[in-house]
């Protein structure tokens, strides 16, 4: 959803270019599958994905959106992309916002710590790593995934069937829930066996996001026409 590895070719001259740069946001959000869907339907989109996010942070971010959105949620089409259940997020009330920080991002994601991010003090690093050692297991991943799917299924009923769910990497367990697409595989299955659709680190490239968009359009049409 976020658009890892989508980088504006016009910015490659910058020192240490990275997709997270604010200068790259219009390109990244415009070429990821959510932005492409917005162009297809000629409607505005809001992308709340974040690199390294978790099922928990997605839920917290969604609740932030509900509190701040000025439109009636029933007038919105809500797409929920579930990541892997073995990721964790922790709320940091002392988070220092940077220029590229959205207002809802006060999280420390385990993926950042395990990936070697250097912007966290030793207390966070120790706590996140200890949490993984003490709690990481398939049972907890399955619980996190089930909790997320069933929460958003409830939102789907509340808002009259305008919530579409899917997984990105694939589900840890199959779940049948109203509004959940492809309960036994994730979006990655549409691109993973086609090198021409992948960026160097195996995220979808621009063409890969177009393929994902094309798989989602019929499902969105079904919801719109229902």
Question: Which residue ranges define each predicted feature?
Answer:
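Serine-esterase "nucleophile elbow" of acetyl-processing enzymes
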Residues: 1-60, 68
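Alpha-helical cap/lid subdomain in secreted, periplasmic
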Residues: 63-226
């Amino acid at each position: 959803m976020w658009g890892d590895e989508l980088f504006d070719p016009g910015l490659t001259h910058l020192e240490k270019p990275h997709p997270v740069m604010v200068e790259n946001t219009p390109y990244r959000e415009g070429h990821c599958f959510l932005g492409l869907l917005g162009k297809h339907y000629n409607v505005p989109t809001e992308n709340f994905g974040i690199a390294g996010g978790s099922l928990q942070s997605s839920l917290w971010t969604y609740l932030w959106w509900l509190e701040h959105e000025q439109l009636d949620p029933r007038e919105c089409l809500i797409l929920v992309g579930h990541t892997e259940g073995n990721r964790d997020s922790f709320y940091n009330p002392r988070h220092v916002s940077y220029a590229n920080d959205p207002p809802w991002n006060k999280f420390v994601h385990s993926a950042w710590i395990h990936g070697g991010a250097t912007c966290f003090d030793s207390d966070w690093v120790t706590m996140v790593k200890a949490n993984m050692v003490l709690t990481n297991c398939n049972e907890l991943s399955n619980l996190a995934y089930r909790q997320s799917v069933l929460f958003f299924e409830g939102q789907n009923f509340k808002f009259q069937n305008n919530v579409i769910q899917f997984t990105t990497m694939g589900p840890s367990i199959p779940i049948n829930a109203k509004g959940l697409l492809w309960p036994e595989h994730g979006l990655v299955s549409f691109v993973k066996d086609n090198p021409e659709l992948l960026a160097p680190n195996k995220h979808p490239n621009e063409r890969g996001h177009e393929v994902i968009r094309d798989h989602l359009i019929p499902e969105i049409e079904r919801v719109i026409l229902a």
